[in-house]
Amino acid sequence: VLDSVQFGRIMRESGATVLYLSAGLFNQVADQLAEVFAQLRYLIVGGDVLDASVIRRVLRNSPPQNLLNGYGPTETTTFATTCRLNDLIDEGSQKIPLGRPIGNTQVYILDGQGQPVPIGVTGEIHIGGDGVALGYLNRPELTAERFIPDPFSDAPDARMYRTGDLGRWRPDGAIEYLGRNDFQVKIRGFRIELGEIEARLAALAQVREAVVVA
């Protein structure tokens, strides 16, 4: 995939019409794959915050029929919301909305007491529905912390996932991402827990204190 020329050839020869790219890879190959993008029915980009300038450039020079921002953590089967960007991004846009929940998925933005926040107010994004995983393998404490009962669902034993992502509802019904409520960062779509790195460094005999920033 890192060889954009070869990847473009494979896409053309296969006749593929749907493509998913991580945000980092999309930014890297957007110009080289312009011809491929223009032939797609769906181009889905996700895994990190999208760069509005790259989105505008693709829509201006090589727009696919549908360019989607796909949002959702692995714990909810990767995609929980989508947003079609073709007619949404203008020259002044800096933030790319996450969009609305996909089918059989519920998204709640809750305050610190677990109550829904009003439109425009920041809260933590929680995701419920059929895509929520059972939990983490051999990590019952973390499972109990992140996968919690869904009080808004009528389904028996329904649970929702606490994402740690901050967001708010826009007046148009779309969700806007506002950052994290912890020290997790993403690099090229991969989760990095800064606290885990700090703990490893602090465990070294030669280290008295450690702070990791990104």
Regions found by a protein language model. Give the residues of each.
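AMP-dependent adenylate-forming
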Residues: 52, 60, 66-69, 84-214
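Adenylate-forming
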Residues: 1-97, 104-106, 111-116, 141
